[in-house]
Amino acid sequence: MKVSKEEVLHVAKLGQLDLDQEEVEMFQDKLSQILEWQEKLDELDLEGLEPTAHALERRNVTREDQVHNSLTNDKALENAPETEGNYFKVPRIIE
């Protein structure tokens, strides 16, 4: 299915996007490609398949927490250009 220039401009207007001619053509191609893929999916025989939101049945798969050795404060701060107490000191970026 070919998406028209007018359809791309309509969607751009809904999204308050200002597209130039090159972008309109690019989106025409991309949206047309997406719709062609959807048409291919529509051809699949899905009779007897249950609707699903996920390909796998797994839910909330977690692992046990494991304690690992970590750096001491002194070791972590060893190569820092500036420190203040037990913290890295970094330049202020917000006034």
UniProtKB/Swiss-Prot annotation:
Its EC number(s): 6.3.5.-
SUPFAM superfamilies according to UniProt: Glu-tRNAGln amidotransferase C subunit
GO terms of molecular function: asparaginyl-tRNA synthase (glutamine-hydrolyzing) activity; ATP binding; glutaminyl-tRNA synthase (glutamine-hydrolyzing) activity
Compositionally biased region (Basic and acidic residues): 55-67
One GO term (biological process): regulation of translational fidelity
Top-level enzyme category: ligase
Keywords: ATP-binding, Ligase, Nucleotide-binding, Protein biosynthesis
Family matches, as Gene3D superfamilies: Glu-tRNAGln amidotransferase C subunit, N-terminal domain
Catalytic activity: L-glutamyl-tRNA(Gln) + L-glutamine + ATP + H2O = L-glutaminyl-tRNA(Gln) + L-glutamate + ADP + phosphate + H(+); L-aspartyl-tRNA(Asn) + L-glutamine + ATP + H2O = L-asparaginyl-tRNA(Asn) + L-glutamate + ADP + phosphate + 2 H(+)
Listed NCBIfam families: gatC
Function: Allows the formation of correctly charged Asn-tRNA(Asn) or Gln-tRNA(Gln) through the transamidation of misacylated Asp-tRNA(Asn) or Glu-tRNA(Gln) in organisms which lack either or both of asparaginyl-tRNA or glutaminyl-tRNA synthetases. The reaction takes place in the presence of glutamine and ATP through an activated phospho-Asp-tRNA(Asn) or phospho-Glu-tRNA(Gln).
Known partners and oligomeric status: Heterotrimer of A, B and C subunits.
Name the UniProt record assigns to this protein: Aspartyl/glutamyl-tRNA(Asn/Gln) amidotransferase subunit C
Lineage summary: Bacteria, Bacillati, Bacillota, Clostridia, Natranaerobiales
Gene from which this protein is expressed: gatC
